[in-house]
Amino acid sequence: EGAKDADGIITSWGIRIDQQVIAGLEKFAVVGVGSVGVDMVDVDAATEAGIVVTNTPDIFIEEVADHTLMLLLACARRVKLMDKMAGRGDWYKGRPVLNEIPRLWGQTLGLISFGNVATAVARRAKPFGMHIIAYDPFVTELKMTAEGVEPVTLDELLERSDYLSIHP
C-alpha cells in the first residue's frame, strides 16, 4: 500500500514482493534486491508487469569467506569443546585435547565449486599453509591454477580432503 506510487524499491531479507504486492503497484519500474538471490521476489509476476528485478551478485563475498575460515578454524581447534571445558572450570584439562589437534599447515582443503566465495576462501587458507584443491566443472583449470589451486575430480577431492567447503 505504501509503495503504490513509488517508482521502485530496494528490498532485502524478510520482505516478500509477491504477485499480490506487484498487482498493487501502479508505476513501479524496478525492484532492487540487496542480496545475491532474488527468491523473495516473484520474478515471473514482476516480468509480466514490466518490472525489472535486479540483484547484488558481489555482496557478502568477503564476509562469507571470512565466516567460512572462522568455522574451519573453530572445527580444527575444537573451539566448542574447549569453550565448554573452560565454562565448567576444566580449562586445565584442555592440554591433552590440544595435543590431538593437527596443524592446518599441510592439511588439504577441498572446495566444491570455485566461484567468487570459494576463491576468497582459498586466498585466506593459503597463508595457513593449506593445500587447496577444487572441483568445479564450470570453471577452467587455468582459473584455478592461477589462484594456486589444484583442479581435481569430485571423487579425488572427496578422497583427499581433510576439510571440505561447498560454495555453490
Model-derived regions, located:
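An N-terminal-biased, well-structured beta-alpha scaffold segment characteristic
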Residues: 1-54
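Residue-level detector of anion-binding/catalytic polar loops
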Residues: 52, 74, 78, 131, ...
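Phosphate-binding beta-alpha-beta segment of Rossmann-like dinucleotide-binding domains, i.e.
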Residues: 49, 57-108, 120-123
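Mobile beta-alpha loop/short-helix "lid" or hinge segments that flank ligand
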Residues: 40-45, 80-93, 130-133, 138-140
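Short beta->alpha connector loops at strand-helix junctions that form conserved
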Residues: 34-35, 50-62, 136, 154-155
